[in-house]
Amino acid sequence: MLTQSKKRIFKHSKAEYTLRTLNSIIDSLNNNKDLFKKLKTKLIIIDHNSEAKVINKFRKLLKNKFFKNEIINLDIEFYKKNIKNINKQGKKVTNNQISNMSNINQSLNISKNCDDLVYLVEDDYIHKIDAIEEMIFAYERISTQLGKELIMCPADYPYLYNKLQNTKVLLGNKYHWRSIDESLCTFLTSKKIINKHFKKFVSTCEFEHYPFEKPFHDIYKKELCISPMPALAVHYTNINSVYGLSPLINYKKLWQKNKL
């Protein structure tokens, strides 16, 4: 989780958010096993200092699943040496942020060597059961229609409704999608996009910008980034965040549904 100074909507531990996120992703993959078997899906968890009991719960959730999966450790010592100590606001970068920046960097390095599509997910996004299927089918449809690769965010962020702005509306599988110019660090894209803009992506992990995701937003000026209406996944951050709870979603029901 990125630096979070305000209380989240539900009073639970970080691990509880992570476990419910993982559970929702597994359920979403199970919702169309034939599709995700054909796509040779692999789920990788990059862990940093989770308690043994939490790791055991990860393993229990992933046991005997039809898709490949792996839990690896964050190599923070390797990545943190590339991070500047002072951020854009002139403040010292926190240890928590160093961990997050290192995790994103390691995720991007793994993504470079994927076969095709890659989905980077922060550990506080709980998914609807049809989320990943919709993302795959919508990517195929829209990418083919436009003749280019895309970037897709699963959340319908509240900030999108704070002001009037022009957007492109596209038809996915069962959802409408619209163009956006900002996101957080959870998105699906292709290996081609990752490699094309790798240096810009990684710059997010070497210097703490303001906003943090500014290099991503710069990429969206060159590549189409879209998000669904309504959301396919909800970012369970504090209730007042413009990047938090998506509108028109029963987020309490979604939270309870993914209780272990």
Describe each region flagged by the PLM:
Residues 1-5, 47-48, 71-82, 154-157, ...:
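Short loop/turn segments at strand-loop or loop-helix junctions that form parts
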Residues 2-17, 91-96, 201-207:
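Short, flexible/disordered intra-domain loops and linkers
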Residues 47-115:
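Active-site-proximal specificity loops/subdomain of glycosyltransferases
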Residues 191-260:
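C-terminal catalytic/acceptor-binding lobe
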Residues 86-87, 111, 117, 128-200:
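Conserved catalytic core of nucleotide-sugar-dependent glycosyltransferases
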Residues 123-126:
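The conserved acidic donor/metal-binding loop of glycosyltransferases
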Residues 9-39:
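Short, acidic, metal-binding catalytic loop of nucleotide-sugar glycosyltransferases
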